[in-house]
A protein has these predicted regions:
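Core catalytic alpha/beta fold that binds nucleotide/phospho-ligands
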Residues: 1-108
């Protein structure tokens, strides 16, 4: 379900409170679900959960890194991610903005 980078980051939370660890996993799952829904496919063969990694910019803003077949099958689009979590909820919103470079077939 989680990418190697996410599992490594989670392992660093070993001494963190149980709520912090649960919040980390819930937020990462929420991003995967939100991305798959933005694609309109759900979590299926075109969108593989452990090929979607949530990372953070230096200023803390989250972004998505795609890999493997999920990247290969991804539309040409800018991915916008908003992520919030407060016990007991984790909410992610993903918007795919069409890449109008002219190289796309127009599908998202």
């Amino acid at each position: 379900m989680f990418s190697p980078c996410e599992l490594e980051e989670y392992s660093k939370l070993e001494k963190a409170h149980e709520d912090v660890r649960a919040q980390f996993l819930a937020s990462r799952f929420a991003v995967k679900e939100a991305y798959s829904k933005a694609r309109g496919t759900g979590l299926n063969g075109l969108v593989i959960p452990n090929e979607i990694t949530t990372a953070k910019e230096k200023d803390g803003r989250p972004y998505i890194i795609l890999s493997g077949s999920t990247l290969d099958n991804a539309p040409r689009a800018v991915i916008h991610l908003s992520l919030t979590h407060e016990q007991p909820l984790a909410i992610a919103m993903v918007v795919l903005e069409s890449d109008d470079s002219g190289d796309s077939d127009g599908s998202l």
